[in-house]
């Protein structure tokens, strides 16, 4: 994370990989680095970070001993702090439109006013979801968050779901985009399952920092057959699973037959 006016360059770096031999040197800042030999943080005064294409090529303090690329953009990071990006493990980016409204709200009121079954489900259009998701992702980058587990419970229809995914992919944020299976009046569970299969086949994931996941809150309350189907889908799609750490989910599940 980079403070001061230089954050714009770092934001561009995090969200866009330029073609060719692009190189950027963030010079003269305070770098919060990592010492692998001592297994601890290493704070470098007058430190610099050299980035080539989409990778960190060097982290150093003082003059650079190597050869700098001939085409180099230098960003003055004096009086700024440079660190790795933060990780947000639970975010609902589509809810950006509600920001500042729920600061004095109980959990029950939150569910009623702003949650997946709130009036938002009937008022928000797919375009509203897209804008909220994209702005929320870019806001995260602005705050130094570069990796997000996005609990996307705005999946009220196929159009809403695709809008949220489109914005996530466009943002460039490294994201575990967790598609939510919910109890929605106008979007049946079977329709949600078929859409998920379509999303698994989306070619945009192959060259993206976004990875598909599943969010599901009803393991203990929903129809067991529905829960089994969701676990089957997760296994079919080779998604990361909590089963290894949750004894309640370690039962053997037959491999389902779904379209390849």
List the model feature ranges, each with a label.
Residues 29, 49, 54, 79, ...:
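Divalent metal-coordination and catalytic microenvironments
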Residues 159-260:
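Metal-coordinating catalytic core of metallo-dependent amide/deamination hydrolases
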Residues 125-137, 191-196:
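Short, acidic/polar
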Residues 97-129, 186, 247-260:
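Active-site gating loops and adjacent loop-to-helix segments of metal-dependent hydrolytic enzymes
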